[in-house]
Amino acid sequence: LFSKSSKTKFIEEQPQKIQLDLSSDESQPQDQLQEMVNEVAEEYEEMVEPDQAEQAAYDPRTDVVETHDQLKQRISRIQYVLANFKEHRNPNLGRPVYIEILKKDVCQLYQYGADTAEILLGLFGPEEFVQFVQACEQQRPLTIRCNTLKLKRKELAQILIAKGAEVEPVSWCHDALTIFKSQVPIGATPEYMRGFYIPQDAASLLPVLALKPQPNEKILDMAAAPGGKSTHICQLMKNTGVLIVNDSNAERIQSLQSNLSRMGCFNSIVINYPGHNIPFTNFNRILLDAPCTGLGVISKDQRVKTNRDKSDLRKMQEIQRRLLWKALDLLDNSNESARTVCYSTCSVSVAENEAVVDYVIKERGDCKIIDTGLTVGRPGLKRFREQQFCPGMELSKRFYPHVHNVQGFFVCLIMKKVGVKCKREYGAKREDK
């Protein structure tokens, strides 16, 4: 059914064969859907290495830079120097000089604002910063999620192949397919209209996989529109239990309801509340795919390059803290409940991810980070600059376009402790301080 020469590269940075567990897809023989994701996302640009005489005294300030090609060349030469600074530097120039020129060149070549570039440079360091930026110039592969409430992935693949599509399974999600070529618009087929599948970025599958919804549970999707993750949750619940689907933006409710209806999600109730004012409680699991700056999805929205600054990070961080705090308040705290919140963003900034989780866990005192169960992704950061994060932060997962060939994403699973009270309400001073 599927080609054995996999083109998909949703993987770890260490090359390895990833075999798909077919235990949940009984219709497929064990010898199919193999040889999935097995190589690192390829390098986006070859590095230019100056000759020995030139590299020993390379001063980027003396370069004539008038064209894009000249900018690219200087970026590559600076990368080369920084990769082994002691050996390749000009003895009259310090490392900050090279880094500052590199940042300015990247901003000019790829049209980034200074604040956005500085945030990314601070996270990645100079070499990986350039790799990330270059990867964001490439579109990610088109993925769809099969609606197993209506048919199996193999059946959907056969239908699309018959229509001239070239498809391949995503190894770490039993319901997802990558579409490489299609003779028909994937978002306008009869099968799409009948709710057989939904186009969904591969990275956006990860939070629901980490949440692990179960049948007959009571689950909340806290910031749900347009509904891709909500319909995924419903699918894993097998249309049982109760799924409360909330979005604070009334203008997005119609599209949310439309997707739920088209996908046949009958266990869902749509509500329209600001996230911090949701009145319902005692949920077994909650998904908070929080509003964010979008610093992981630049390939989808190039405006993020220039319309974000450090003040946006501070404002967004306050919103995220408040929403995560509220989500933990809404959990059922009994032994029988899963008591978990999956916190995710499509941003790579530390301020919106580890820093938010760290603040809430330390200030509340009634919750902890647990393993996401995701087998791909880099570990969350234990520390960043002078900030040491709470224990378990490495159990969270980070995803990058230049490493995993998906949009930039952060996923963290948090469990509420049984019998432990929160130290304070949000916004109040802690009594133990």
Predicted regions and their residues:
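S-adenosylmethionine
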Residues: L1-K433
